[in-house]
């Protein structure tokens, strides 16, 4: 698009062809938002099986149910061929930004996507980096990689994803940060996203958008750590931590409620807080609170295990008590086990002599939970009164809405509810 007016006209007429690189938990909902706004969307992914599943309308993210809707829209096409992206006017990059074994950002997915797009995109195409990255990544790493591949002409912007899996919140209703490396890129991404998102928020630089996203998740990390530490205190005082939180939440200012739990999980919160701590270290700034929060998160599963055995001892339990874990996914109603607390709690329970089984109605049939020796633990498919009553302790790690919690509350011999799922169920 040669002029701002021609780009704006193409947006209004929905004549732009949009691409999405990476069809996972960020890219697929974004593709859905694009198609709902009326744009034709080409979705690219390295995983050919994922592409084939989407082409057939089969869900690859059970908590979204997007595949059939995308297929029925008639405006979405998945592909495994990067050359197809040549036809796109705008491409959103939604590749993973994991940490490597040393806790440092693994830049390989970013570099690979930049090299690929440099090879195939038409002149003056717009790239919108949606992946969560440290400040300076868009300008230094991504733009310099494009230039190194002979494509300084490509426009580049950053608009960090704000996906909240399982929350039921419309992606397009969440305010959308955005910034371009140039005025032209900034104007284009704002013009485009004004036709898709309810509240596009243009900020002064890509670095501001990058830092804001890391701070958002670091804020959650620190406050969840505080909630978990406070729940430990309440446990020692024999106080219901959620009753205390209910009381505190009546204050209309200066308080935001964060729930305690068995530990943090998922892709974002642990990683993004670590990324921000890494940035602090690089610039010589302290990150004491972030580092302490990380330690609290690391210790939390062990605290849950100790509480389990304390409860069992108090009941005069067997040498090998039977424990049923309900909810292995990292959060409510989400089919994801990445960094889930259950992955470390179950092995510790089995190492301590417990006979551990598990139930999770959200996870697919291929899901596995292992003991301390790496052996798959038995899965319980049906959670009824007979099943629940067969265990010395029911440990609640995820409060899925499809579980009949009244059955658990009524028929369990003993429970450790880390999510508040059993409150007011009896």
What residue spans do the PLM features occupy?
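Structural/interface elements that position substrates and couple domains in central-metabolism enzymes
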Residues: 2-426
């Amino acid at each position: 698009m040669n002029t701002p007016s021609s780009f704006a006209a193409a947006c209004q007429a929905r004549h732009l062809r949009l691409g999405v690189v990476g069809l996972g938990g960020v890219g697929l909902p974004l593709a859905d938002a694009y198609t709902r706004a009326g744009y034709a969307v080409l979705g690219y992914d390295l995983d050919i099986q994922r592409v084939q599943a989407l082409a057939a309308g089969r869900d690859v993210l059970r908590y979204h149910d997007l595949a059939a809707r995308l297929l029925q829209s008639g405006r979405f096409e998945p592909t495994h061929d990067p050359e197809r992206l040549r036809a796109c006017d705008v491409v959103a990059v939604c590749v993973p930004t994991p940490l490597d074994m040393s806790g440092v950002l693994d830049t390989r997915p970013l570099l690979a996507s930049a090299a690929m797009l440099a090879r195939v995109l038409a002149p003056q195409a717009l790239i919108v980096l949606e992946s969560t990255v440290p400040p300076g990544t868009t300008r230094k790493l991504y733009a310099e990689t494009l230039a190194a591949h002979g494509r300084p002409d490509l426009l580049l912007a950053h608009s960090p994803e704000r996906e909240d899996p399982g929350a039921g919140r419309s992606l397009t209703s969440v305010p959308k940060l955005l910034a371009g490396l140039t005025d032209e890129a900034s104007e284009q991404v704002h013009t485009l996203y004004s036709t898709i998102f309810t509240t596009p928020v243009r900020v002064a630089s890509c670095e501001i958008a990058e830092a804001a996203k890391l701070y958002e998740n670091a804020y959650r990390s620190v406050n969840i750590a505080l909630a978990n530490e406070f729940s430990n205190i309440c446990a020692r005082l024999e106080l219901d931590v959620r009753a205390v939180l209910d009381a505190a939440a009546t204050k209309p200012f200066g308080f935001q409620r964060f729930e305690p739990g068995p530990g943090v999980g998922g892709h974002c919160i642990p990683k993004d807080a670590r990324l921000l701590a890494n940035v602090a270290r690089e610039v010589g700034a302290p990150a004491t609170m972030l580092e302490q929060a990380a330690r609290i998160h690391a210790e939390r599963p062990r605290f849950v295990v100790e509480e389990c055995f304390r409860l069992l001892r108090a009941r005069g339990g067997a040498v090998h008590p039977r424990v049923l874990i309900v909810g292995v996914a990292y959060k409510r109603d989400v089919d994801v086990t990445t960094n889930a607390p259950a992955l470390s709690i179950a092995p510790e329970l089995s190492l301590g002599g417990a006979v551990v089984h598990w139930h999770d109605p959200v996870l697919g049939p291929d899901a596995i939970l292992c003991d301390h020796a790496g052996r798959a633990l038995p899965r319980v498919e049906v959670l009824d009164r007979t099943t629940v009553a067969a265990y010395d302790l029911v440990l609640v790690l995820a409060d899925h809405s499809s579980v009949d919690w009244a059955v658990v509350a009524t028929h369990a011999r003993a429970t450790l509810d880390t999510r508040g799922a059993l409150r007011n169920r009896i």
